[in-house]
Swiss-Prot record:
This is Interleukin-19. Cytokine that functions as an anti-inflammatory and proangiogenic factor. Polarizes adaptive immunity to an anti-inflammatory phenotype through induction of T-helper 2 responses by both down-regulation of IFN-gamma and up-regulation of IL4 and IL5. Produced by osteocytes, stimulates granulopoiesis and neutrophil formation. Exerts its biological effect through a receptor complex consisting of a heterodimer of IL20RA and IL20RB. In turn, activates the Janus kinase (JAK) and signal transducer and activator of transcription (STAT) pathway, and importantly, STAT3. Belongs to the IL-10 family. SUPFAM superfamilies: 4-helical cytokines. One of its GO terms (cellular component) is extracellular space. Keywords: Apoptosis, Cytokine, Disulfide bond, Glycoprotein, Secreted, Signal. Glycans are attached at residues 56, 127, 134. GO terms for molecular function: cytokine activity.
């Protein structure tokens, strides 16, 4: 009887440890202070959203991001950061030096996040599923429907959606 209880206990502990390990593999933790990125965004948010003339259009859909499966989070995050780096930050034309400094700070922070993701990809090989590829394509299609400068401005104004999603999916939750 003791052997059976010990075997059951051992099996139970093994399953618990495996589930914890699998859960940790779902997430790719990033080593960037998101509060600094959020602070820079909040300092330019009003300027971006005031200039936005397409109030009823969205490029970065919260519903689209919520549909991302845990196994695609690393891939989708990398896709979104690449989108912002290669399209939004490049396409945006800004006259205010202060806003430019804030955008540059955000862009540099995104590069640091991407470096963290590269390390994660090396160790965990986070590949993109078809759903993640489709979600990325939808964002690019939404962006392409607007004139370039309007699309860049709109995307900058929607950074809070991306930042909240990154917070929810990449930051380590404190132990209870």
């Amino acid at each position: 009887m003791k052997t059976q209880c010990a075997s059951t206990w051992l099996l139970g502990m093994t399953l618990i440890l495996c589930s914890v390990h699998i859960y940790s593999l779902r997430r790719c933790l990033i080593s960037v202070d998101m509060r600094l990125i959020e602070k820079s965004f909040h300092e330019i948010k009003r300027a971006m959203q005031t200039k936005d003339t397409f109030k009823n259009v969205t490029i970065l859909s919260l519903e689209n991001l919520r549909s991302i499966k845990p196994g695609d989070v690393c891939c989708m995050t990398n896709n979104l950061l690449t989108f912002y780096r290669d399209r939004v930050f490049q396409d945006h034309q800004e006259r205010s030096l202060e806003v430019l400094r804030r955008i540059s700070s955000i862009a540099n922070s995104f590069l640091c996040v991407q470096k963290s993701l590269e390390r994660c990809q090396v160790h965990r090989q986070c590949n993109c599923s078809q759903e993640a590829t489709n979600a990325t394509r939808i964002i690019h299609d939404n962006y392409n429907q607007l004139e370039v400068s309007s699309a860049a401005l709109k995307s900058l104004g929607e950074l809070n959606i991306l930042l909240a999603w990154i917070d929810r999916n990449h930051l380590e939750t404190p132990a209870a």
